[in-house]
Swiss-Prot record:
Pfam families from the UniProt entry: APH
Pathway given in the UniProt record: Amino-acid biosynthesis; L-threonine biosynthesis; L-threonine from L-aspartate: step 4/5
Keywords linked to the UniProt accession: Amino-acid biosynthesis, ATP-binding, Kinase, Nucleotide-binding, Threonine biosynthesis, Transferase
Annotated InterPro entries: Aminoglycoside_PTrfase (IPR002575), Homoserine_kinase_II (IPR005280), Kinase-like_dom_sf (IPR011009), Pseudomonas-type_ThrB (IPR050249)
Family under the similarity heading: Belongs to the pseudomonas-type ThrB family.
Protein's organism: Zymomonas mobilis subsp. mobilis (strain ATCC 31821 / ZM4 / CP4)
PANTHER family reported for this sequence: AMINOGLYCOSIDE PHOSPHOTRANSFERASE DOMAIN-CONTAINING PROTEIN, AMINOGLYCOSIDE PHOSPHOTRANSFERASE DOMAIN-CONTAINING PROTEIN-RELATED
Protein name from the UniProt record: Homoserine kinase
A GO molecular function held by the record: ATP binding
Length: 320
């Protein structure tokens, strides 16, 4: 979450009037974390909300898909924030020239250093979402799939990546060739979250209270979602592999939705694809963010290390 578009108290008060029983505005607080949209914590005399203004990286035409997705998951009693409907039944409005939604506020906070039990709970929740999404009929193309990794790598420049870390660009080129040959495109597909990092999961203690930020959700190889989550949760901030977290994540997932034998057999390839996807998007930001920018780009070398780790790993060493 972040703040790019400013709004006044008067604008927010008028916006709240569009919604029944929304209450009288008491406070507005910008949420500075994240990079995609502008987000505010809105407090009224009735309840709290998240006000989201969608910035240029989000296609307004895709917002109904995201609303339908979170509505579906929330209707199945999963802790996902749904968008409130205005008096005329609309979830998407306009505020300060941007598409905007008033979104349910969930209790809890994210943790930068999740423990093994929190990781297990996240795996269990991901499995519950995957089970629910077996009967969700809408689709959205993955704009960051293998085809687009090639495009992104070319735009970044292989030599530019070599400047970030020795041999990074050379190894990315080889990895793309490998994934072209071995990507398991025939595995079961569904809508996936595609960005289930610790900052998108809310906890009170070890109790999981919410899953947020579905704006990368898309239709893709389902087990790749678990591979992304694995890559985000099973390494510490110094990029050391956390075997106890890995076992906990897989255990939690299997408590609610088991991998097939084919998914299990392909999991290392999926992990390599997960590492490459985030290496490339971070490399792009690293190369293209001006030195004086207020936003500090995330380091692509973290996922370069994970990619190298996965190349040498076995399923047994990964917690299976």
């Amino acid at each position: 979450m972040a703040v790019y578009t400013s709004v006044s108290d008067e604008e927010v008060s008028s916006f709240l009037d569009l919604y029944p029983d929304s209450g009288r505005l008491l406070s507005i607080k910008g949420i500075t974390e994240g990079v995609e949209n502008s987000n505010y914590l809105i407090t009224t005399d009735v309840r709290s909300y998240i006000l989201t203004l969608y910035e240029k990286r989000v296609n307004p035409e895709e917002l109904p898909f995201f609303m339908a997705l979170t509505d579906h998951l929330a209707a199945e009693n999963l802790p996902v924030p749904k968008a409130w409907k205005s008096r005329d039944g609309k979830q998407i409005q306009t505020l300060a020239g941007r598409p905007a939604c008033l979104i349910e506020f969930l209790q809890g906070r994210w943790t930068p250093t999740p423990n093994a039990e929190q990781t297990r709970a996240t795996g269990e929740m991901l499995g519950k979402m995957h089970k629910s999404l077996t009967h969700f009929s809408e689709n959205r193309k993955n704009s960051l799939d293998l085809e687009n990794w090639h495009i992104l790598a070319e735009k970044c420049g292989f030599e530019a990546m070599n400047q970030i870390e020795a041999h990074m660009g050379d190894e990315v080129k080889k990895e793309l060739d490998y994934l072209d040959k071995f990507w398991p495109k025939d595995l079961p597909r569904s809508v996936i979250h595609a960005d289930l990092f610790p900052d998108n999961v809310l906890f009170e203690g070890d109790s999981l209270k919410g899953v947020i930020d579905f704006y990368f959700a898309c239709t893709e190889v389902r087990a790749w979602d678990l591979a992304i989550t694995y890559s985000a949760w099973c390494f510490d901030q110094e990029d050391h592999f956390l075997a106890d977290h890995a076992k906990a994540l897989i255990k939690g997932y299997h408590q609610s939705f088991a991998l097939t034998e084919e998914e299990r057999a392909a999991f290392i390839v999926l992990l390599r694809g997960a590492a490459l996807r985030f290496l490339l998007t971070r490399a792009w930001d690293w190369v293209n963010t001006p030195p004086d920018a207020l936003v500090v780009p995330k380091d692509p070398r973290d996922f370069f290390k994970r990619l190298r780790f996965y190349r040498e790993a076995s399923l047994e060493s990964l917690g299976f």
